[in-house]
Amino acid sequence: MPELPEVETVRRGLAPALEGRRIVHVTQRRPDLRFPLPELFAKRLTGRRVIRLERRAKYILVYMEPAKSGGAEDVLIMHLGMSGRFTVHGPSGSSAPGLFHLGMPGGETHDHIVFDMEDGTRVVYADHRRFGFMDLVAEPELASSRHLAALGPEPLGNEFSALVLAERLKGRRAPIKSALLDQRTVAGLGNIYVCEALYRAGISPLRTAASIGPARVERLTAAIRAVLQDAIAAGGSTLRDYAATDGELGYFQHAFAVYGREGEACSKPGCGGTVRRIVQSARSTFYCPACQR
């Protein structure tokens, strides 16, 4: 599943194709994705101008002008799931694919939603597994919607700090890795970047969340921010399932210190340890037991 850096990369790729432009036609080829699409989905979007695209955790938020004068903005919430893929076809017919396809082709069979923009741009959403979803929410109700209400702070936002993280870890007996994957703790973190952040902070994934003292929390907060910023700058991580909206592969996976490196020597100078893989909550955890305490 794409994590925060990959979703942010897709948002940045879609923004030039959508922002400031009106949707002139929506093709809806099935009534549902992971969940049923909203009632009158295509009709409610047709004719609306896109104001801006934002990201919250692993969701892309498309803000649209009000349907009626004086009304509230509607927000299209999009989640890519495991296999969602956007492809942007320019007015000239050129294509800039934004892939989340696990190495499988899209093709019209899996092209479920098509947005035609006023300048001739066509944005196609394909999803062969249909684990992604879309929803429409009035802007005043966005923060309290079922998708966003329980989310923790954005790790790259001003509301995220060592003090905030320490408060959210207080009294929790779960392993620190499990606590960080809980979207109520910090929004948008996934398996890859939690492994990498814990490594940079020198914290064992087996340590209980409540045992992370102030100095470690400071290091962890800084490591989370740094790992995410580095990954976004690299265009995300290409494993089997990701390329950016311009078709370029993300390359942060080449900078992985521990993820996917079981049995390799720790890259930290003077450590001498070996990267180990364990399973926590049915997910692979990669860490160096010699320098992560």
Curated annotation (Swiss-Prot):
**GO BP of this protein:** base-excision repair
Q: Out of the domains of life, which is the source? A: Bacteria
Q: Where is the active site?
A: P2 (schiff-base intermediate with dna), E3 (proton donor), K58 (proton donor), R283 (proton donor)
Q: Which UniProt keywords apply?
A: DNA damage, DNA repair, DNA-binding, Glycosidase, Hydrolase, Lyase, Metal-binding, Multifunctional enzyme, Zinc, Zinc-finger
Cofactor(s) the record lists: Zn(2+)
Respond yes or no to whether keyword Transmembrane is given for this record. no
Q: Which family does it belong to?
A: Belongs to the FPG family.
Q: How does it assemble?
A: Monomer.
This one is known as: Formamidopyrimidine-DNA glycosylase
* Natural source organism: Parvibaculum lavamentivorans (strain DS-1 / DSM 13023 / NCIMB 13966)
Gene symbol? mutM
